[in-house]
Amino acid sequence: MTGLTIDFHNIPGAMMRVLNAFTRRGLVIESVWCGPSGDHHRAHVLVDAQAITIEQTVRELESTVGVDGVAPLNESEEATLLRHAKQ
């Protein structure tokens, strides 16, 4: 599993564009959590994919309108998301 955190503007369609970056590549999203973070929103997404696919998805997200940044989740954040996904 790989976890990413994506910071984006709270504008119409922004979350849809973020999630579409994963679904266009045929990735199954295991878990997603989204909430406000200051004047932006932050999504934590957990997917099971090969490293090259994650790299391509990160590049696409970084060029997506409204996305400010993409970073990997640390292991404890990934474990928390996975635990919540299995409940």
Language-model regions, residue ranges each:
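A conserved regulatory-domain signal marking ACT and ACT-like small-molecule sensing domains
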Residues: M1-Q87
